[in-house]
Amino acid sequence: MNKEIKSIRGMYDYFPKDLKIWNYIEIIFKEVLNSYCYLEIRLPILEKTEIFKRAIGNVTDVVEKEMYSFNDRKGNNLTLRPEGTVGCVRAIIQNNLLQKSNKFWYLGPMFRYERPQKGRYRQFYQLGAEVFGLDTEDIDLEIIILTNRLWKRIGIDSFITLEVNSIGSKIDRVQYKKELVNFLKKREYLLDEDCKRRLYTNPLRILDSKNQDIQNLLKEAPLLSEYISFSENNHFKNLCNMMNHHGIKYKCNPHLVRGLDYYNSTVFEWKSNKLGAQNTICAGGRYDSLVQEMGGRKTPAIGFAIGIERLVLLVKSLKIFSEVIEESNVYIIFIGDNNKCHAINLSEEIRDLYPKLRIFINFLHQNLTKKIKNAISSLARIIILIGDNEIKKGFFLVKDLKEKKEYHLLKKELILKIQEIFK
């Protein structure tokens, strides 16, 4: 007995019903990013494992537990990218891209070995955007305004909230980590197993624990904001003042940290309470040391990533986008194989004149009644019938399914009717 063929756990197929929403969202992404002068780049899904370890941090969950890594035939250790920023930074260093531009965006699959659940998959798609060379809070603000504009264009701005924080510099966090660890060690018996592990590897990640008991415990913990420098604190205050001025609603979350070691200063997340546990739609922040740490010159930077699957889940749950799929605009039915060539020729002539129309020819061996039923179920606007009688008399029988009318039209008249209907 043959084993049933299945996809890999946590990796999913996507079909036209969902991809209609995906494509709609991607069009909005591209239009908005273009309006802010971002340029698209396309990056490999495989990178050398070492660059992720150096950039993300050896004691992060991503590197310790979640990366898909393997040796190729020459013994090179490679990893399916778990996120996009590191590959983008590698590309701009390797190709000297900062000589030409400083704003880039990319879209594609990422891979993490996590426990699959709604909104969290082992292969998932992200849109990422990165800005290099600017260290003031002005670009932090522009990034946040840009993402806010995306939500407005998609129609979800009323169902998504912004959380912001400053995690200071790496130097600021050294002293804070000591104080946080001292606080938590005295209460280690109250920690869950995951937090006990993080206490000795990456204690800052305890701050964003989803365990409510841990969050209650952290109410008494020292605050990171009390340990960041004057300049970092001033940067964050200026950003908050600017967001207030521009009408951006936000919440300061002192426990917001990012799971990747390269972040510093401003961090932010856009969340929705409509998605359950995996409620972060978009996350980002500054990473002013990463370019230099990866071998480039010192270059401040900031970026964000949007989880496409979670965004699609939100759009679907809010029912703000029609899931109806229009399979065709024009549905051509030929009667008799001798008229197949006429159907093909007509379809190509229409495509030449109206390249945006969706034209379907029914090549199935079905009776006329069945073919017409298929045309109706495909949500076609018009049916064009081509039979011996039509060819002999030089006209086409056209059925307008929306207006429930029939026409007998010469080819020139047919072309004009199509222009009239689909103008």
From Swiss-Prot:
Coiled coil regions, renumbered to chain = none
User: Can you state which reaction this protein catalyses?
Assistant: tRNA(His) + L-histidine + ATP = L-histidyl-tRNA(His) + AMP + diphosphate + H(+)
User: Could you tell me the keywords of this UniProt record?
Assistant: Aminoacyl-tRNA synthetase, ATP-binding, Cytoplasm, Ligase, Nucleotide-binding, Protein biosynthesis
Q: What is its main location?
A: cytoplasm
GO MF terms here are:
ATP binding; histidine-tRNA ligase activity
Cellular compartment(s): Cytoplasm
**Is the keyword Nucleotide-binding in the record?**
yes
InterPro entries linked? aa-tRNA-synth_II (IPR006195), aa-tRNA-synth_II/BPL/LPL (IPR045864), Anticodon-bd (IPR004154), Anticodon-bd_dom_sf (IPR036621), His-tRNA-ligase (IPR015807), HisRS-like_core (IPR041715), HisRS/HisZ (IPR004516)
Enzyme Commission no: 6.1.1.21
Please provide, in alphabetical order, the Gene Ontology terms of the cellular component aspect for this entry: cytoplasm
- A Pfam family this chain is assigned to: HGTP_anticodon
Instruction: Supply the HAMAP family for this chain.
Output: His_tRNA_synth
| UniProt-listed PANTHER family | HISTIDINE--TRNA LIGASE, MITOCHONDRIAL-RELATED, HISTIDYL-TRNA SYNTHETASE
Q: What is this protein called?
A: Histidine--tRNA ligase
What is the protein's species of origin?
Answer: Buchnera aphidicola subsp. Acyrthosiphon pisum (strain APS)
Q: Which gene encodes it?
A: hisS
